[in-house]
Amino acid sequence: MPKMKTNRGAAKRFKKTGSGRFKCKHNHLRHILTKKSSKRKRKLGPKFMVSAADHKRVVACLPYA
């Protein structure tokens, strides 16, 4: 049986934690930042954990993570 392929787009966006969950970066923090409030930009700063609803799809994209 051939090897399963890793989705390279997902590999660049998600990192697996020690507990087996995945973390990734918020969006909307690259450009056009002047109209966004400091509070909004601060909330978008830290990484966040992928929800349980999306976890199965991320695992399918990253079979060797």
Swiss-Prot record:
Keywords: Ribonucleoprotein, Ribosomal protein. It comes from the Bacteria. GO terms for cellular component: cytosolic large ribosomal subunit. It holds the Pfam family Ribosomal_L35p. One of its GO terms (biological process) is translation. One of its GO terms (molecular function) is structural constituent of ribosome. NCBIfam families: rpmI_bact. Belongs to the bacterial ribosomal protein bL35 family. This is Large ribosomal subunit protein bL35. It comes from Aeromonas salmonicida (strain A449).
